[in-house]
Amino acid sequence: MIEHPSLKAFNFKKWVEDNADQLKPPVGNKLMHKDADMIVMVVGGPNTRVDFHDDPVNEWFYQVKGDIILKIADQKGIYDIPIREGEVFMLPPHVLHAPQRPQVGSIGIVVEGARHAGMLEGFEWFCFNCQTKVHRVEVPLDVPEGIVDKLPQIFESFANDIDARTCENCGTLHPGKGPAPEGWVNI
């Protein structure tokens, strides 16, 4: 057998061990492949999010270790989709979602389509009291590293803006980037 000089498989478990320090909060994800027409990320827990992501491309989830809850929001409400260890799930484009990874040491793989010039990703926050949308931000994330670099800035900006965090419907103040309310995630 003649092995290819540059294309080689690698040990995923060792890769996770070598990158364990980057699979922790606040975002807890690490890009696996940079030179591809898809984005392959490894995501670690614990991490619970209080924002909802509006992705213009499909997202494929494979839960390697531990369980997660994928919160989904639409016009009728907020729902939970459990993704258990060993399970996969395909999320269609533009479905508002908030991955909840409350288990320490959980590991998942998320594969997304490549971003192209002009594509925008949205981030929305909903009132925990009445489920009204309190804020939305759209940003171009047309490079794989974009989400890793831009998410902390997006979250910080929202957390520091009292007006953006105040629900126009009921006046409740969203916690910003603080912890989600008790009972938000039940695995």
Regions found by a protein language model. Name each.
Residues 1-62, 67-88, 96-187:
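Jelly-roll (double-stranded beta-helix
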